[in-house]
């Protein structure tokens, strides 16, 4: 017969002494107590019988409460308990509030059983301790005058977590009062009077109804149309749906206390939110950042910083580097600049970028930094700087093998392997997975098939908001090649199907469903106009190769052209961009000194490291332990040869 282990043990707090008291086995008791339900109301309910009765009445009565406790199934399918906060009625029996709707309470899905305790203490103990139960119990801790008795167990609870909505009264609306006195009263004479008061032929139906016959005793402004209020004003049921962000500059110490070091200045980065023809491209920085920079030139201290931080000197050095970079390349992605700007002056880069560049928040150049005065819509030479976003699907990333193949992103500050240029690991060449999947077009043409498509591109006469200077078909070709090769590489396959790549390069239509039935379709959409008099495609024309012919002759399955191979292209979500670029916050931290800034950057780099224990090697785990406990890591390294997966034990 197996021996049962104790449910709990009581032991002394470990100290430095070698002799410790042996652990004491705790006494175990069975609580044979009644189970009772609990109703947590957002009301001030007293112990008086009338107060409890009123609370139950606001919930629809005791039967409604019982029905709510008996509900089963997922919380989404429960009807819940309706709590009417303003269930008042007027003297005529009608509702006081228009469309008064209740707050819905539902059963807690995870039942955490609570024990109700009856605490007995000598009379007058509470008054001696300022009516504090906690202090009263503490004062009787060492005496035998305190008695605690378990009474019952709460195992079923209904809570009201929704917000109460705004409630509306229509007492001061004449048309509402007339409607209420007629239809609301259900009196025939009132009905008849109301109907007769409405003109048969309204010569001015657009006028306020208050200007007609209805209750002329009340003056109503012509702007008050007396429209019925919306049935619900608050569109959010729970007060938790907000994008909370912790202070990125707050550091938590070992004792758990969070501390914010340094001061903060605003970078005043200029954004352009519209791509219409009327949009004027900025030619200089925000007036406030220009003013601050002029003050810094005179005083040698940037406003909001301290002189010993040397922020202005670092800013001047950063500006010199960025001006040279923007002279060579007018449009940049910030992550590319992170590897070029030296670590010691990197903290000034947001201010420097605000002084020499602006940003689009939409369109083909979104989230890039563009030199002031440069309008990428003005010339096709800026087509190569358009951005494309790619993403590995979650179903692939759930595989440990794929996770291991995907490269770790670079730290916040790093050193480019190309001095003064974009790190080669940001470029897509079909031979390795790039660090960052927000790719500019000119970083894709290192792949031969994409280069072939790019060099045969016929640009549009005018850039548009969706595809920029490119025709949609050309962008689709590039995207399909990237998605196919990217999906192969993350799965460890670097041998591509040449027939698939050939098909992608010679695609005639954006989608197979867009094959036109006539030759008058739009130019630039890959329309096959090479048809004879009967409308049949001329199969002898080599330049117009049928996609079906490629599939059948070269063994490409019918659905392969729709397979993204585990990689997708889409609009970037805001959260991903904020986490990756870290440049959407207008507030910039200014370190107290240069040394403080270097320490902060190192801490950020450590936080950015991604560590997965399922795919990490023995050495990776040892290195991780060494950061916390070097001595233990050294012992494990010398005594162990490796770890065994728990599934193999």
From Swiss-Prot:
GO terms for molecular function: DNA binding. A motif (Nuclear localization signal) lies at residues 296-300. Residues 1-21, 556-612 are annotated as: Disordered. One of its GO terms (biological process) is transcription by RNA polymerase III. Residues 221-419 are annotated as: 2 X repeats, Pro-rich. Residues 9-19 have a biased composition (Polar residues). It holds the Pfam family Tau95_N. GO terms for cellular component: nucleoplasm; nucleus; transcription factor TFIIIC complex. Keywords: DNA-binding, Nucleus, Phosphoprotein, Repeat, Transcription, Transcription regulation. Residues 560-584, 594-610 have a biased composition (Acidic residues). The modification Phosphoserine is found at residue 617. Coiled coil: none annotated. Sequence repeats lie at residues 221-239, 400-419. The keyword Phosphoprotein applies. It is found in: Nucleus. TFIIIC mediates tRNA and 5S RNA gene activation by binding to intragenic promoter elements. Upstream of the transcription start site, TFIIIC assembles the initiation complex TFIIIB-TFIIIC-tDNA, which is sufficient for RNA polymerase III recruitment and function. Part of the tauA domain of TFIIIC that binds boxA DNA promoter sites of tRNA and similar genes. Participates in the interconnection of tauA with tauB via its contacts with TFC3 and TFC6. Serves as a scaffold critical for tauA-DNA spatial configuration and tauB-DNA stability. Component of the TFIIIC complex composed of TFC1, TFC3, TFC4, TFC6, TFC7 and TFC8. The subunits are organized in two globular domains, tauA and tauB, connected by a proteolysis-sensitive and flexible linker. Interacts with TFC3, TFC4 and TFC6. PANTHER family: GENERAL TRANSCRIPTION FACTOR 3C POLYPEPTIDE 5, GENERAL TRANSCRIPTION FACTOR IIIC, POLYPEPTIDE 5. Present with 15800 molecules/cell in log phase SD medium. Belongs to the TFIIIC subunit 5 family. This is Transcription factor tau 95 kDa subunit. It comes from Saccharomyces cerevisiae (strain ATCC 204508 / S288c).
């Amino acid at each position: 017969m197996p021996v049962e282990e104790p449910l709990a043990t009581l032991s002394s707090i470990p100290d430095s002494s070698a002799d410790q008291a042996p652990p004491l086995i705790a006494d175990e008791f069975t609580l044979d107590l009644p189970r009772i339900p609990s109703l947590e109301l957002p009301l001030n309910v007293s112990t008086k019988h009338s107060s409890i009765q009123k609370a139950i009445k606001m919930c629809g009565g005791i039967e409604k409460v019982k029905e709510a406790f008996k509900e089963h199934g997922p919380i989404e399918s429960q009807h819940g308990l309706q709590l009417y906060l303003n269930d008042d009625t007027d003297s005529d029996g009608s509702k006081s509030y228009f469309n008064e709707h209740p707050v819905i309470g539902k059963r807690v899905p995870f039942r955490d059983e609570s024990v109700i305790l009856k605490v007995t203490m000598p009379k007058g103990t509470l008054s001696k301790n300022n009516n504090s139960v906690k202090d009263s119990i503490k004062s009787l801790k060492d005496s035998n005058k305190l008695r605690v008795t378990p009474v019952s167990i709460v195992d079923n609870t209904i809570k009201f977590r929704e917000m109460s909505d705004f409630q509306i009264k229509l007492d001061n609306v004449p048309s509402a009062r007339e409607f209420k006195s007629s239809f609301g009263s259900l009196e025939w004479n009132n009905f008849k009077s109301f109907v007769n008061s409405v003109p048969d032929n309204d010569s001015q139906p657009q006028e306020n109804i208050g200007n007609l016959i209805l209750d002329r005793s009340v003056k109503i402004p012509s702007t008050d149309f007396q429209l019925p209020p919306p049935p619900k004003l608050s569109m959010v049921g729970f007060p938790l749906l907000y994008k909370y962000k912790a202070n990125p500059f707050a550091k938590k110490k070992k004792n758990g206390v969070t501390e914010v070091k340094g001061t903060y200045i605003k970078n005043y980065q200029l954004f352009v939110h519209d791509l219409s023809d009327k949009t004027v491209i900025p030619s200089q920085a925000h007036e406030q950042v220009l003013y601050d920079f002029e003050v810094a030139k005179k005083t040698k201290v940037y406003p909001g910083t301290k002189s010993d931080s040397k922020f202005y000197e670092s800013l001047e050095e950063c500006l010199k580097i960025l001006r040279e970079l923007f002279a060579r390349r007018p449009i940049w992605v910030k992550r590319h600049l992170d590897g070029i700007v030296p670590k010691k002056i990197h903290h000034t880069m947001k201010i420097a970028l605000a002084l020499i560049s602006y940003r689009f928040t939409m369109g083909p150049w979104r989230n890039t930094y563009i030199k002031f005065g440069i309008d990428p819509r003005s010339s096709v030479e800026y087509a190569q700087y358009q951005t494309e976003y790619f993403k590995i699907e979650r179903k692939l990333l759930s595989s440990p093998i794929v996770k291991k193949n995907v490269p770790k992103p670079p730290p916040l500050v790093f050193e480019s392997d190309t001095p003064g240029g974009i790190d080669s690991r940001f470029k897509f060449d079909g031979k390795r997975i790039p660090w960052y999947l927000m790719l500019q077009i000119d970083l894709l043409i290192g792949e031969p098939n994409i280069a072939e498509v790019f060099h045969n591109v016929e640009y549009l006469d005018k850039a548009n908001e969706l595809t920029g200077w490119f025709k949609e078909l050309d962008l689709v070709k590039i995207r399909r090649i990237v998605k196919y090769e990217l999906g192969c590489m993350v799965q460890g396959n670097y041998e591509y199907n040449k027939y698939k790549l050939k098909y992608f390069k010679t695609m005639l239509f954006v989608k197979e469903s867009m094959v036109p039935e006539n030759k008058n379709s739009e130019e630039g959409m890959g329309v096959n106009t090479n048809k004879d008099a009967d409308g049949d495609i001329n199969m002898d024309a080599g330049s117009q190769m049928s996609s079906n012919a490629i599939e059948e002759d070269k063994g490409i399955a019918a659905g392969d052209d729709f397979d993204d191979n585990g990689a997708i292209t889409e609009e970037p979500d805001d959260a991903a961009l904020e986490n990756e670029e870290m440049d959407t916050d207008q507030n910039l931290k200014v370190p107290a000194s240069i040394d403080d800034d270097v320490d902060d950057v190192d801490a950020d780099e450590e936080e950015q490291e991604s560590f997965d224990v399922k795919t990490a090697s023995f050495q990776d785990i040892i290195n991780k332990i060494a950061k916390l406990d070097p001595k233990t890591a050294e012992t494990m390294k010398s005594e162990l040869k490796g770890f065994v997966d728990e599934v193999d034990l």
